[in-house]
Structure formats: structure tokens, C-alpha cells
From Swiss-Prot:
Biological process annotations from GO: tRNA wobble position uridine thiolation
Organism field: Haemophilus ducreyi (strain 35000HP / ATCC 700724)
Name of the coding gene: tusA
InterPro entries in the record: Sulphur_carrier_TusA, TusA-like, TusA-like_sf
UniProt name for this protein: Sulfur carrier protein TusA
Active site, renumbered: 17
Keyword terms: Cytoplasm
């Protein structure tokens, strides 16, 4: 992890597309604007899907670690 403060952690290890993004959407829907979600994943599809999800839904991908699994993502909820 990093020194970024997180408000919620989502562990999607072992899940495959489309489950990680579906759970991300469901989780972030119940968060407040500006809160940070940390996601842990091992599905290679998340390296494409999570950034696309953030762009499409107007959330901010603060940081990602995708060089080797498990992949890590820090998302700041937008509007």
C-alpha cells in the first residue's frame, strides 16, 4: 500500500472480469464524494477496466500499481 489515506478497502483477489469492476461500482456508489477507495486485484483485465471505469464515471484514479499482481488502485470518488 501507500501513504494515501483510504476510506474503504475492496479485495477482489480471485475474481475475474467483470466482477472486479462491478464490485467497484457497487462499493463506490455507497461512498461520499472525495472518499478514497483502495482496490486489490489480480485479474489482468483490471489494468484496462479500472482506469476506463474511472474516466467514464468521473472518478479520479489517484494511483495504481500494475507492474505485477496483486494490482493496487486508489480511486477518489467524484460526483
Amino acid at each position: 500500500m501507500t501513504d494515501l489515506p483510504v476510506d474503504k478497502i475492496l479485495d477482489t483477489l480471485g475474481l475475474r472480469c467483470p466482477e472486479p469492476v462491478m464490485l467497484t461500482r457497487k462499493t463506490i456508489r455507497h461512498m461520499q464524494q472525495g472518499e478514497i477507495l483502495f482496490i486489490l486485484a489480480d485479474d489482468p483485465a483490471t489494468t484496462r477496466d479500472i482506469p476506463s471505469f474511472c474516466e467514464f464515471m468521473d472518478h479520479q484514479l489517484l494511483k495504481s500499481k500494475t507492474d505485477t499482481p496483486p494490482y493496487e488502485y486508489w480511486i477518489k470518488k467524484g460526483i
